[in-house]
């Protein structure tokens, strides 16, 4: 990857405590799973370098605390994000029902330049658990995504490494596209209106 321009992309992972955000992040970056992770305090992050469309991309993945008492810290971590990953546990209906509040809070705190097109992705985690324990159907999750601008959806298992790599490949592409679109928008700044009197010149020939 030497010689290629590198892009740093900030990705925020949000969801209720216990849905598996830390496990998903560690499975993606380190290809490891542990059932003994402690609840994240505040926020933590890992980085991974990948190649996306012949571009070297460093993903900075922020794993944020799912407890309400840490949500006030959001503005410090969310600003400058290029993509947001929403995670819920398919076996926990409450974790699905609170997704909108996480999404709305992110948009308020992060203040992206174009909230309507800012890239989100939804992960339904812990699909390795027995089917009879499942509380949120795939069709319900897809309906949620469709109603919010066709958000990409993956059903994942951090434990079994199901769809984790595939999900973050999509994250990297979405984040890179968002960064590129922001760069283009920045090139089209407001026109500068000059005082016409100051532009008048005289030529004495």
From Swiss-Prot:
MF terms in GO: GTP binding; GTPase activity
Cellular component terms per the entry's GO annotation: cytosol; fungal-type vacuole membrane; late endosome; vacuolar membrane; vacuole
Traits of the deletion mutant: Asci produce less than 4 spores, which are immature and germinate at low frequency. Cells are defective in development of the forespore membranes.
Entries under InterPro entries matching the protein: P-loop_NTPase, Small_GTP-bd, Small_GTPase
Membrane spanning residue stretches: none
Keywords, in A-Z order: GTP-binding, Lipoprotein, Membrane, Methylation, Nucleotide-binding, Prenylation, Protein transport, Transport, Vacuole
Motif (Effector region): 37-45
Lipidation (S-geranylgeranyl cysteine): 203, 205
A Pfam family hit: Ras
Keyword Membrane: yes
Family: Belongs to the small GTPase superfamily. Rab family.
Species per Swiss-Prot/TrEMBL record: Schizosaccharomyces pombe (strain 972 / ATCC 24843)
Principal location listed in the UniProt entry: membrane
Residues with PTM Cysteine methyl ester: 205
Chain sites annotated for binding GTP: 17-23, 33-40, 66, 125-128, 157-159
Name of the protein: Ypt/Rab-type GTPase ypt7
One annotated GO biological process: Golgi to vacuole transport
Regulation: Rab activation is generally mediated by a guanine exchange factor (GEF), while inactivation through hydrolysis of bound GTP is catalyzed by a GTPase activating protein (GAP).
Function of the molecule: Ypt/Rab-type GTPases are key regulators of membrane trafficking and intracellular vesicular transport. They act as molecular switches that convert between GTP-bound and GDP-bound states, and regulate virtually all steps of membrane traffic from the formation of the transport vesicle at the donor membrane to its fusion at the target membrane. In the GDP-bound state, Ypt proteins are predominantly cytosolic, solubilized through the interaction with a GDP dissociation inhibitor (GDI).
């Amino acid at each position: 990857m030497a010689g290629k321009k590198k892009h740093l992309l900030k990705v925020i992972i949000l969801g209720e405590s216990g849905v598996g955000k830390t496990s998903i992040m560690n499975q993606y970056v380190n290809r490891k799973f542990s059932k003994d992770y402690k609840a994240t305090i505040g926020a933590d992050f890992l980085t991974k370098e990948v190649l996306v469309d012949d571009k070297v991309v460093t993903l900075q993945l922020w794993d944020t605390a799912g407890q309400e008492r840490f949500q006030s810290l959001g503005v410090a971590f969310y600003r400058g994000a290029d993509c947001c990953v929403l995670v819920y546990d398919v076996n926990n209906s409450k974790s699905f029902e609170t997704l909108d509040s996480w999404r709305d809070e992110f948009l308020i705190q992060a203040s992206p330049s174009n909230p309507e097109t800012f890239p989100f992705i939804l992960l339904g985690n812990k699909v390795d658990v027995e089917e009879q324990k499942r509380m949120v159907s795939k069709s319900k999750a897809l309906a949620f995504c469709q109603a919010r601008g066709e958000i990409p959806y993956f059903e994942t298992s951090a434990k079994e490494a199901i769809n984790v790599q595939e999900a973050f490949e999509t994250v990297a592409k979405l984040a890179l596209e968002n960064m590129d679109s922001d760069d283009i928008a920045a090139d089209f700044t407001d026109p500068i209106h000059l005082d016409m009197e100051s532009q008048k010149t005289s030529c004495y020939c």
